[in-house]
């Protein structure tokens, strides 16, 4: 009798830990996905929390958005953590806050009709050592951050708004005249070469950028001067374990939206991730050097790559040497983005064991995008993609671009690409990226500019790719270059112009079974 009573008590306690009121994802949901993987996928545990609640209203949070609620929200999180964990509740309302740090064993739950704005006041954001776009640098504190935390979650129905339009440079070419004038009137700032910057310091920092968006600064005092340029990613978890993000909306991030780095056991489910289509570096989710990840039933409508796998850039990424591995992406929709599902270009630590199933891409610049360039190094391998539909794709449905130049698909001139392609091929070294052992099947595409484009490196061709049961209607067909080991089985390309398939002389070991 005592044993039965004890078991019932344990069951009651465990049930209270993950009450459906605070999160709906179950371990069974995730286990069903991980068991379906084409590779050996470890169990991804759902974090559990004690049955204790802490309402930010009790700590002085202002639901009108007039006063900052940073201290109240952080106090609630800290108190919850100090007492062994539980759930911090942000009730219905409008909240203005600075950066908040999530702590171990804390679930942040947002009620319906709740929106959290992150104030763009630079004084609230400290500068610290960080990684951005795959290399070490300095950035401002991320609005939502966690460092080496375990068992953390953000759930509920609320919206997190990063106020990114106060941070991001903006190109006039991406706006209508009315939108441009409205932005200048509301935000002030300065304009240089038809690009808006929040202030002169941000423009100054741009002049120090030798490669993309990371300034090369040797004078430490200058970092504070150019602070407005050091846009943070909105959610940044580093070295964390057992993570759940569920049900909420993340939008309007200063740079990338969601960025777990060097984390383990991550579940993203039922999320709505949004950024304006013109947002500079407005990625959806960037999984960097993480393992055991499930992304399920999420919606993305963003300004850059939507669902992206990364692992560091060039020598710093290779030195870190942590791949992104064991990832499942299932039942996701992408509306706008530079790519629906993307590997790279920062993949120097490697990417392996990734399965993408049942995805829909509507109007993304590219559907499935694999990109890198000389100097990266790293290996992308064991990628399995099945069941993808895509429509209204203005560039490629499937793209392998090993001459990536840092611009969105379609933005680079033919002369720029030709200059890189015509350069003398170097010897294979640790700086040579490799893409191999990739299966893509059951893909349907309609209204695509070019169905498929493979452009590998002459010194390291794209290796061992299987394309099976694919149908695409496009303006142009499929073009393959620098590929070794290509299986084309039951693939139907319907081009409006030219040939359905074009294989350059640099393609080897091809087997084609066309419909």
Where are these predicted regions, by residue range?
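Extracellular/periplasmic carbohydrate-active domains that bind, remodel
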Residues: 17-515
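Sec-dependent N-terminal signal peptides
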Residues: 4-13
């Amino acid at each position: 009798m005592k044993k039965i009573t004890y078991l019932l008590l344990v069951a009651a306690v465990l049930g209270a830990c993950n009450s459906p009121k605070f999160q709906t994802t179950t371990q069974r949901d995730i286990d069903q996905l991980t068991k379906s993987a084409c590779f050996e996928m470890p169990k991804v545990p759902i974090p559990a929390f004690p049955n204790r609640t802490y309402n930010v209203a009790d700590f002085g949070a202002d639901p009108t958005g007039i006063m900052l609620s940073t201290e109240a929200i952080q106090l609630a999180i800290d108190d919850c953590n100090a007492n062994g964990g539980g759930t911090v509740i942000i009730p219905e309302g409008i909240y203005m806050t600075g950066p908040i740090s999530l702590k171990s064993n804390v679930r942040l739950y947002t009620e319906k009709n709740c929106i959290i704005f992150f104030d763009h006041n630079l004084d609230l954001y400290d500068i610290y050592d960080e990684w951005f776009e795959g290399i070490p640098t300095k950035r401002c504190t991320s609005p939502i951050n966690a460092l080496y935390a375990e068992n953390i979650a953000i759930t509920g129905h609320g919206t997190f708004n990063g106020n990114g339009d106060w941070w991001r440079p903006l190109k006039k070419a991406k706006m209508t005249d009315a939108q441009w004038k409205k932005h200048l009137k509301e935000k002030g700032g300065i304009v240089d070469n038809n690009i808006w910057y929040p202030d002169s310091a941000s423009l100054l920092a741009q002049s120090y950028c030798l490669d993309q968006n990371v300034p090369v600064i040797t004078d430490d005092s200058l970092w504070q001067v150019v602070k407005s340029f050091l846009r943070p990613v909105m959610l940044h978890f580093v070295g964390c374990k057992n993570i759940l993000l569920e049900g909420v909306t993340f939008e309007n991030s200063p740079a990338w939206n969601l960025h777990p780095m060097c984390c383990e056991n991550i579940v993203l489910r039922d999320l709505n991730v949004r950024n304006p289509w013109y947002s500079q570096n407005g990625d959806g989710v960037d999984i960097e050097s993480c393992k055991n990840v499930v992304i399920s039933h999420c919606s993305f409508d963003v300004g850059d790559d939507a669902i992206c796998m990364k692992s560091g850039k060039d020598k710093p990424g290779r030195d870190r040497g942590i791949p992104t591995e064991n990832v499942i992406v299932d039942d996701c929709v992408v509306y706008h983005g530079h790519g629906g599902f993307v590997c790279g270009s920062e993949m120097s630590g490697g990417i392996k064991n990734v399965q993408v199933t049942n995805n829909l891409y509507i109007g993304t610049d590219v559907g499935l995008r694999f990109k890198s360039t000389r100097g990266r190094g790293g290996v992308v391998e064991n990628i399995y993609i099945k069941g993808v539909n895509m429509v209204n794709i203005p560039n490629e449905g499937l793209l392998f671009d090993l001459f990536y130049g840092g611009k969105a698909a379609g933005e680079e001139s033919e002369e720029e690409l030709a200059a890189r392609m015509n350069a003398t091929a170097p010897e294979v070294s640790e700086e040579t990226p490799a893409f191999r052992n990739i299966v893509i099947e059951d893909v349907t595409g309609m209204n695509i500019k070019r169905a498929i484009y493979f452009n590998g490196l002459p010194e390291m061709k794209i290796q061992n790719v299987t394309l099976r049961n694919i149908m695409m209607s496009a303006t142009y067909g499929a073009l393959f270059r620098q590929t070794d080991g290509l299986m084309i089985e039951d693939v139907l390309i319907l081009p409006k112009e030219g040939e359905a398939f074009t294989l350059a002389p640099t393609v080897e070991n091809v087997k084609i079974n066309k419909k």
